[in-house]
Amino acid sequence: DVEPLLGFLSPKSGQENEVDDFPYKGQGELXXGIVEQCCHKPCNIFDLQNYCN
């Protein structure tokens, strides 16, 4: 259950509020790591879980 974790997330961390940094799909996906994805901009719990699996 992710409900208790929602308090730790930024208000902009939901998928509906995401803004793509790269206008062309796939442009930024080649060298994206956890730092680029979750430190330089907010990420959601699902993005974090992808790095733990």
From Swiss-Prot:
Residues 1-30 form a propeptide. One of its GO terms (biological process) is glucose metabolic process. Its main location: secreted. The keyword Signal does not apply. One of its GO terms (molecular function) is hormone activity. Pfam families: Insulin. It is found in: Secreted. Keywords: Carbohydrate metabolism, Disulfide bond, Glucose metabolism, Hormone, Secreted. The keyword Membrane does not apply. Disulfide bonds join 38-43. It comes from the Eukaryota. InterPro entries: Insulin, Insulin-like, Insulin-like_sf, Insulin_CS. GO terms for cellular component: extracellular space. Belongs to the insulin family. Insulin decreases blood glucose concentration. It increases cell permeability to monosaccharides, amino acids and fatty acids. It accelerates glycolysis, the pentose phosphate cycle, and glycogen synthesis in liver. Heterodimer of a B chain and an A chain linked by two disulfide bonds. This is Insulin. It comes from Anguilla anguilla (European freshwater eel). The lineage of its organism: Eukaryota, Metazoa, Chordata, Craniata, Vertebrata.
